[in-house]
Design a protein with these regions (language model features):
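Acidic, Ser/Thr- and proline-rich intrinsically disordered linker/docking segments
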Residues: 2-17, 22-81, 85-153
Length: 153
């Protein structure tokens, strides 16, 4: 099913809501879920995927593609994306329980977390994300190849 847009810049999400695409700051894909967050980390759309028309994996992919094609999004892998313009900070987390990269938005809201167990890989991913944000700010966005970085560690 193709995502229907009633007006340019808007999208009908899998949960039936119509949202301005510029509102969506983060796309989180889990096994059978698709979640959209806005810049302050609040959930604006949540849908459980199934075989039902309008809620399939293909529908989620089409919805994701429509949103990420509307602006510059960093691809974090596994269907997760974050809008460049909403990223306020990229932090490495070296905690005992959680190790990875935290991406923060407005008011320190967590927009995404990328689990990475190895310190060297965390540092390289953080550097790649920083470089991507610098390229975005310069008007020449370059998508970081996080898959390549993570596959070598």
């Amino acid at each position: 099913m193709t995502r229907k847009t009633k007006r340019k810049g808007f999208i009908q999400t899998l949960d039936g809501n119509t949202l301005a695409m510029k509102l969506i700051a983060s796309i989180i894909r889990l096994e059978d879920l698709i979640i959209f967050l806005e810049g302050k980390g609040r959930q604006v759309s949540y849908a459980k995927l199934s075989d039902k028309e309008g809620r399939t994996v293909a529908d989620a992919d089409a919805c994701t593609d429509a949103v990420i094609n509307s602006d510059s999004f960093i691809n974090l892998g596994k269907g997760n994306h974050v809008r460049c313009s909403t990223i306020e900070a990229v932090e490495t987390c070296n905690g005992q329980d959680h190790k990875g990269i935290l991406i923060r938005g407005e008011g320190d809201a967590i927009l995404s977390f990328l689990p990475i167990s190895q310190l060297e890989a965390r540092e390289k991913v953080a550097e790649a994300l920083h470089d991507a944000l610098v390229s975005y700010e310069a008007g020449k966005f370059v998508q970081p190849d996080l898959t390549k970085i993570l596959s070598t560690h």
